[in-house]
Amino acid sequence: YGLGVLPYFPLARGLLTGKYSSGTAPEGSRLASRPEILEGADLDQLRAFGDFARERGLTELEVAFSWLASRPAVTSVIAGATRPEQVRQNAQAISWVPTGEDEAALDQIFPPVDKVALF
């Protein structure tokens, strides 16, 4: 249909940054004031995602942004930043191109769901 997708919260409110895989939010972090987000997270998935990234010499940010950018329907990745170095990191984060094996491994970590809406 020629539609594009603009993913909102490409880092899952920060869960895909690696900062929260221990299950605790660092003081002053965005999720420190939103404990319900971290409480609902699957920490095993977050740790497996971090392992996946490190095995490839990447950061979680690079994997998340690059995977999204590699999707044909994705027209852009919304990349918020609170510090200047984050702008640079975000811009450089889409250089990795996942292989079919990488995509299969990510599907094992985050199995596709049947329904993504609340209705």
Model-derived regions: residue spans:
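Flavin-dependent oxidoreductase catalytic cores
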Residues: 21-22, 82-85, 111, 116
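Short secondary-structure boundary/hinge segments and terminal tails
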Residues: 15-16, 71, 86, 109
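Conserved short secondary-structure transition element at the edge of the structured enzyme core
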Residues: 10, 38-95
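Extended hydrophobic/aromatic segments used for targeting, binding, or gating
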Residues: 97-118
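Glycine-rich, positively charged active-site loop/lid region within alpha/beta enzyme cores that binds
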Residues: 1-52, 116-119
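Short amphipathic alpha-helical leader/targeting segments
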Residues: 28, 32-33, 78, 94, ...
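Compositionally biased, intrinsically disordered/low-complexity regions enriched for serine, proline
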Residues: 4-7, 69, 108
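Short alpha-helical linear motifs
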Residues: 22, 86-91, 104-105
